[in-house]
């Protein structure tokens, strides 16, 4: 089955937007901002070490690049409370996204590893698990 060029084109457009950043360096920026992705916002998302571990896991499984897309900045006392509760630096500013775009290698072995990781993350949420169609990207979206 040929790759879905529309799907890859959309992902390529997303990673080029000004609100998109390379995920690991974004998460590890030493500026005391609370950064999170995924899950129903701040409470169930990935933050701190858990977020870094998740992105590093994708890289170990063969991801060429992991991009956080649609990053927004939020400020308020609620952010400070959640950061302290999670043992993260005390701050009232957070950057967050509910989307990651994962560039997968062209070799099918790496694609299988990353597709399996995607299935482990989302399969329980009743999404259709993608198959290896030669696509260049996987899309992680938590709503």
Q: Model segments located where?
A:
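Acidic, proline/glycine-rich low-complexity IDRs
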Residues: 116-143
